[in-house]
Amino acid sequence: MKQNAKVYKGNTAVMKAVNAGEISGGVIYHYYWYGDQAKTKENSAHTKLHFFGNGDPGAFVSVSGAGVLASSKKQAMAQKFLKFLTSKAGQEIVADNVYEYPLLDTRTGTNKALAPLDTLGAPTVDPAKLNSSTVVDLMTEVGLL
């Protein structure tokens, strides 16, 4: 891969290159593809998603988190927002408009276009055991950051 890989600036650029036939495949976050499919399909009309599965590292599931800074001058509003974000209504927005997997229903979520999370065959990884400085170094090295 080091000798033959092409580096693109971002998920959309990779998807455009695959769509145009410039490259035969690329690795992107699924929600870029679902978002484009739901709108114009301009960058994804000639593409399909492939999920690595079988515990392959390429099938990793990244996680997102949210919190409130202790220094925030709007603690109550921020807490209210987080409460909404983690509610059923908030998670429906996450799944239906951003194409992320919702926290509350990881089997299918509300967006039926998403492949059920429990069918993706992701490797077993404990996010709490990941070394964030090593991850950042690797992502920087390959141009993701």
Regions found by a protein language model. Name each.
Residues K16, A20, A76-K83, E92, ...:
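Solvent-exposed, polar/charged alpha-helical surfaces in well-ordered, non-transmembrane soluble domains
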